[in-house]
Amino acid sequence: MRVRRAVAVLLSTVLAGGVVASPAGAAPRSHGDGGLPGRHSLRAPVTDENFYFVMADRFDNGDPGNDRGGLGDDPLVSGFDPTRKGFYNGGDLAGLLRRIDYIRGLGTTSIWLTPSFKNKAVQLEDGPSAGYHGYWITDFTQIDPHLGTIAELRALVDAAHARGMKVYFDIITNHTADVIGYEEGARQPYVSKDVEPYRTAAGRPFDDRDYAGRPGFPPLDPEVSFPYTPVLDPAERTLKVPAWLNDVTLYHNRGDTTFVGENSLYGDFFGLDDLFTEHPRVVRGMIDIYKTWIADFGVDGFRIDTMKHVNDEFWQRFGPEVLRFARQHGKREFFMFGEVFDTTKSFTSHFTTRDRMQAVLDFPFQEAARDFASRGEPAGQLGQFFVDDDWYTDADSNVYQLPTFLGNHDMGRIGGFVRADNPGAGDTEWVARDRLAHELMYFSRGNPVIYYGDEQGFTGPGGDQDARQTLFASRVPDYLDDDLLGTDATHAQDNFVSGHPLYRTIGDLAALTQRHPALRDGAHQHRYGDEAAGVYAFSRIDRHQQREYVVALNNSEQAKTAAVPTYVAGGAFQRVYGSGPARVTSAADRTLTVSVPPLSTVVYSSVKRIPASTAAPAVSLAAPAPAAESRGRMQVTANVAGSSFYEVTFYAQTGRSGWTPIGTDDTAPYRVFHDVAGLHAGTKVKYRAVVLDNRGHTASSRTRDARVPPPAVTIEAPAEGSNVRGTVEVRAVADPERATHVVRFERSIADGAWTTIGRDASSPAYTVFDDLAPLSLATGTQIRYRAVLAEPDGTRVTSAIRTVRYAGPPLTTATLHYYRPAGDYDGWGLHLWGDAVDPAVLAQVAWDRPWPPTRIENGWAEYDIPLVDDTQPVNFIMHLPNGDTVPTSREPGGDRSFVPIDAPQVWIVQGDPTVYTSPPPTS
């Protein structure tokens, strides 16, 4: 270990209190003795925004003259029907401009608009419903006429900029409106690449992943290249703009996605035309489209829809090129963030590390915030949640850039969640929990996003159309019966009330964080968490001010007291938010005792700076190792022998290259998850860490070596212990995934020899279909599968064995047993769907007509379900006719399912989301 003053690389400006600061993002420079500089944790320009996310059609109707988009009076042509939640309701850009100061009054610094491009007004196949939401684009160069004009957009952007606010566009690269049909019929089921590969115009099979991000993509022919033959209605051959979008070979043309595995990347979203984003023409075209909006309209950033459904190579080109263009055109703070609808940080962080995008929407935070504030889960869970923020740390991005949110237009509103999670609690508690969720969002790391209407206490019974109420007076019956939190108002009137308690709360939180910037983008250090509902506490520390803010939130319905660790011994702290003593003092052991009222938050700030360090602490590296959650990420952890505000920079070196910074962490435990997916297995990587203390001293660790592990291959299907018959899909995935992988599948019958049953080289999922029929197996025969992955460099990896059994004759009926303690089964039935269920049954089932019980026996309602394929899922919802409110008219658990070949009988119990495969206790 080397310890010295980092004079050569630190800015020699002495701040108040004698603290020496180094320049943010200082370029690393090796010293003659091999030393490496300490660096500050990255703070990109966008770590302190307050977003307001608004659906223009549902905000305010400033110009009734554009309601029908110039398409006439027929709602099935114009898409305008203010009495239906799935149609245009009348909001527009003029309404946004008229109410822009209402938005600003919340402390908003950035307005995020749902897509405003010209949409297909109505898709008759979808309900029917209209493109009011903006996600069915036909013309990427024009504003939807229902929303206004180019001139009105310019006026809105100018007005926002004049008020110090930015404007973000919601953009789409994954798909367009549903225009392409198939000769084989509309909206066909997905056909995998393993069943039918892509073919060149000459008919030669190929894997598109071999060409993604590279020149030389093979020529395609709509008659030859796809599993379905794409066709256009003659009236729509030139509907899309720019014109290249009318080339049907620039789409995947594989049928509808089920949002799982390969088809999640290649399938159509409910018929929406899925772009061939592996094709260089699509990549170039999308980059050019969005460059134009930056250059011509001065937009400040993009929210990118459906990011996880587009291949990595697209983002690796799109993000850096668009960002570079924006900065060349004067947008130094241009910022892009993507929708990755997943709550696993090892996955969501993939897009900001390997894919080089700036940020993603923080879906993991949304789930954690709901668990804490609405569901009253153990407070300590938040501690582990924030500790895992290290997944996002790399050399050019980190978690502080992520937009955080509590609900949205797809999943539903925080107001709806607190009502559903706390039935019968009453308005006072619902408002308190809603406020608590917003306090957590504003005081923790990230850029908070307010979903329009949340500031007025909007609720709604669910997501999608049920969470898209108008702020102006509604005529939609489904909205008119919604209750609002914190008010006696209804949706029958305009709701632009600046005096609403939640509007005031949000405005106050924004103002407070502006006065105390550390609460916006200071280091977020986990401090304390109760094992049950109670206090969660963390510190926010600005590296320049060096004052510690202690934030303590209580999700219990009782007052709680906690001794919160700090970096200050015997120091005074003053209250800056919440109720309690105006001034408290930390103990000699540096704990600060705070009392927090029920469902409330308090914030205290140290009066003086954190004590200045006299020397950098010792730092050492734990042995680097592949992360359990992602084999392409190497977990590198630094142990720092001290307890104060430190910033630890990690470096990596391969071969004879120089040391490269791979991220700086400013909160303990100090870690990065280095992306090594692009390196060959066995490659030696050296790591070092440099700690920078709060007075500019640095210390270096010794070097630790690691070798890049081989990829892992895992069989996904069939499920372990399942029953199979006929043709079995055997599917595997690799971690990390590379287009160069080849996977061989092997099978063993009754512990016999392993036999190869096929190979697959088509990324991203590897599949063979094993026909068992010729084997004439007896019922119960054991079958084992394994997968062997090969890389071009000779690496070979074998999966764990997957064991299944041969099933007996096909089942014709499955039975679901349902228990209600009171025996009140009248009206309760099953909404059914899926390929397992007899179509004759599905034809009888509707939302207002669920499948009824066959009998009531021994206190249970029993539902016999006729089948046509017992190997497929039976999907179900237990509810009353038209019932969609948990728990009064619908059972919890969302869309549930079971596979009859594995579970011919299942049991469910009132209020319990579990699907049991044996009778559960009912006492």
Where are the language model's segments positioned?
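Aromatic-rich carbohydrate-binding modules that target alpha-glucans
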Residues: 74, 664, 753-767, 822-870, ...
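Active-site clefts of carbohydrate-active enzymes
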Residues: 399-427
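Aromatic/hydrophobic beta-strand junction motif of beta-rich domains
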Residues: 634-642, 730-735, 816-820
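Extracellular interdomain linker/stem segments of modular secreted and single-pass surface proteins
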Residues: 707-714, 806-811
